[in-house]
């Protein structure tokens, strides 16, 4: 199979698509497939990136948006003409336009709702509107155009890969037949967790005492991740745990507002910014509780990482999260936005070592469902399916 991969970002840039493709593509090559990639770069000039054992072409982001999209589309049209299938990871429109001429089978990996995320980022809708509310609410003309565009290019794909049943239902709501949707869960490379330090050693390396209550949240700092609620919640339970320490890993447009909220709450919050995977694993290992209090998750990769690190998880019962966590078995689920329930759950885990241990043990069994072998097998089968 000759596979042409289209992605908005690629290694060494950070982010989900980059990490996913960096691991997936060598595995597909190992299985005898030929791979080529087109993506973007922050460098001034476009061109071939020689740093990979397969062709990677980068289009510069320095061009104005419309011209950038035109160049990206033209390059797909020119470079993908001899390939069997187009595999789109997070960047659908240019490849669909190019394919009006190429007429190739397309597999689209869809992990969210582009129209919703774009509308939130550009303040076209209330930033507190959830992804589910967005699907059924009345919107202005700009949002409606974006929704129609998203539905159009999604329906043009031969097959859509989604990371959870929840996202599958979301996509079906745009007019896509469920027969064209394949659920392929995210995965972890468990070998990366084989040599993790003990909790005590991780804390020693990071400079924290063994008795310090540490709560960690790791997420892109955008409104739907609920980090503001986590800060307020930790401030409320500080009377019970005077030395409690909150760490926030990740960065994003909400960071300045969150830092201001931490100061107003008189809470010592440590904003860590982006961290390497290995460093984040050590931080996860040192934490007593990992919290993900989002109002939306397609498939929470950070929850899988926390589980692999042996850190008990508290998460909001939404989206793909409920496909990973079973309440009181491998984590604690709380209603989205309910800060009182979140506070109670964190208190439980900080006060009950036996519960924390029970959840960590339950998580070990859960992780078996999220293996790379399974992801690669199902992804390869989906790609071959559209050819055959």
Label each region the model flagged.
Residues 6, 209-225, 231-234:
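Conserved donor-binding/catalytic core segment of Leloir-type glycosyltransferases
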Residues 74-77, 81, 130-160:
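Membrane-proximal helix-turn-helix segments that form the acceptor-binding/catalytic region
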Residues 154, 274-275, 282-287:
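Short alpha-helical donor nucleotide-sugar binding micro-motif in glycosyltransferases
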Residues 166, 187:
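Carbohydrate-associated surface elements
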Residues 259-275:
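Nucleotide-activated donor-binding/catalytic signature segment of Leloir-type glycosyltransferases, i.e.
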Residues 295:
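Aromatic "clamp/platform" in nucleotide-sugar-dependent glycosyltransferases that forms part
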Residues 312-315, 325:
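Short hydrophobic beta-strand element within catalytic cores of glycosyltransferases
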Residues 327-328, 332-339, 348-353:
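Conserved acidic donor-binding segment of nucleotide-sugar-dependent glycosyltransferases
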């Amino acid at each position: 199979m000759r596979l042409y991969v289209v992605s908005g970002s690629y290694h060494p840039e950070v982010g989900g698509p980059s990490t996913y493709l960096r691991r997936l593509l060598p595995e597909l090559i190992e299985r005898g497939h030929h791979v080529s990639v087109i993506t973007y770069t922050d460098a001034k000039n476009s061109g071939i990136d020689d740093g990979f054992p397969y062709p990677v072409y980068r289009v510069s982001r320095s061009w104005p948006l419309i011209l950038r999209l035109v160049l990206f589309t033209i390059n797909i049209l020119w470079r993908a003409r001899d390939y069997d299938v187009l595999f789109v990871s997070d960047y659908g429109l240019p490849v669909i336009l190019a394919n009006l001429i190429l007429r190739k089978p397309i597999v689209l990996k869809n992990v969210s709702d582009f129209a919703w995320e774009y509308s939130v980022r550009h303040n076209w809708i209330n930033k507190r509107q959830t992804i589910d509310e967005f699907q059924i609410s009345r919107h202005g003309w700009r949002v409606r155009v974006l929704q129609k565009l998203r539905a159009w290019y999604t329906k043009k794909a031969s097959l859509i890969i989604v990371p959870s049943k929840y996202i599958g239902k979301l996509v079906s709501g745009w007019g896509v037949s469920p027969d064209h949707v394949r659920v392929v869960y995210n995965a972890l490379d468990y070998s990366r967790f084989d040599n993790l330090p003990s909790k005590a050693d991780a804390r020693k390396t990071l400079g924290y005492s063994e008795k310090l209550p540490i709560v960690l949240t790791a997420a892109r700092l955008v409104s739907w991740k609920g980090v503001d609620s986590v800060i307020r919640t930790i401030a409320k339970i500080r009377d019970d745990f005077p030395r409690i320490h909150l760490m926030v890993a990740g960065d994003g447009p909400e960071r300045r507002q969150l830092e201001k909220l931490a100061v107003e709450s008189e809470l010592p919050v440590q904003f860590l910014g982006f961290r390497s995977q290995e460093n984040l694993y050590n931080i996860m290992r040192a934490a007593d509780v990992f919290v993900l209090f989002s109002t939306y998750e397609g498939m929470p990769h950070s929850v899988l990482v926390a589980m692999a690190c042996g850190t008990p998880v508290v998460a909001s019962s939404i989206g793909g999260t409920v496909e990973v966590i079973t309440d009181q078995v491998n984590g604690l689920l709380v209603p989205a936005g309910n800060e009182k329930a979140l506070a109670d759950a964190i208190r439980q885990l900080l006060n009950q070592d036996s519960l924390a241990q029970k959840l960590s043990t339950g998580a070990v069994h859960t992780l078996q469902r999220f293996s790379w072998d399974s992801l690669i097998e199902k992804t390869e089968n989906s790609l071959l399916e559209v050819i055959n």
